[in-house]
Amino acid sequence: MERKVFSKDGKEIGTINLDDRVFNIEISHGSIYNAIKNELSNLRVGTSSTKTRSEVRGSSKKPWKQKGTGRARVGTKRNPVWIGGGIALGPKPRDYSYRLPKKVKKLAFKSVLSLRAADENSFKVIENFNVESGKTKDLALIIKNFASFNGKVVILLGNDDQMIKRAGKNIRDLKILSFDKLRVVDLFYAKNLIALESAVNKLNEFYIK
């Protein structure tokens, strides 16, 4: 698949090949769903905790005798039915993370890249560039040539360029990611996806293995 390449000023300067084995496969929505679920689950801290009837403070003495009072029978003030009692079936600290099979994860990345590449308006390939100043305004001027800031924007890099990442720190709803540190959830929910030439070449090599 051929795709136009733009300069950082927004002018068309050539084309680049998007490998069909990465950017033009049959989309597996199930693998995308499972990958996003996995990524979000792995982010969960899992520290929610409640006290059971055995953990709350208070006497375990029977409030009144079993029979003869006309009241409902009760065994302890720590009963979950009572105010101040324990919580029945409440959350406890747990680990929500789990591993996704490599084949499913790889298929999810290929599927979401194919999904995004199918829309030329929201997926742009631009020449490799540097932001030597590290200033936000310099990067913002480049981004405005390809995307509006009324939604999430993701920039894909071919390497870990710290100056570009530094320049983008203060831009709301912008994520700058290296090709080897992508998440399906970021690619799927981005309104605009901007990939540098080097990132496309690296993705072509990385996912056809």
From Swiss-Prot:
Which ranges are annotated Basic residues under compositional bias?
A: 59-72
The UniProt entry, under Gene3D superfamilies, shows: 3.40.1370.10
Question: What role is this protein assigned?
Answer: One of the primary rRNA binding proteins, this protein initially binds near the 5'-end of the 23S rRNA. It is important during the early stages of 50S assembly. It makes multiple contacts with different domains of the 23S rRNA in the assembled 50S subunit and ribosome. Forms part of the polypeptide exit tunnel.
Q: Which residue intervals make up region (Disordered)?
A: 46-72
Give an example GO biological process: translation
HAMAP family in the record: Ribosomal_uL4_B
Q: Does the keyword Ribonucleoprotein apply?
A: yes
Q: Which GO terms describe its molecular function?
A: rRNA binding; structural constituent of ribosome
Q: Name one GO cellular component term.
A: ribonucleoprotein complex
Show the stretches that span the lipid bilayer: none
Subunit comment? Part of the 50S ribosomal subunit.
Record protein name field: Large ribosomal subunit protein uL4
The protein's gene is named rplD
Keyword entries, A-Z? Ribonucleoprotein, Ribosomal protein, RNA-binding, rRNA-binding
InterPro entries in UniProt: Ribosomal_uL4, Ribosomal_uL4-like, Ribosomal_uL4_dom_sf
State the superkingdom. Bacteria
Q: Does the keyword Ribosomal protein apply?
A: yes
Give the record's family classification.
Belongs to the universal ribosomal protein uL4 family.
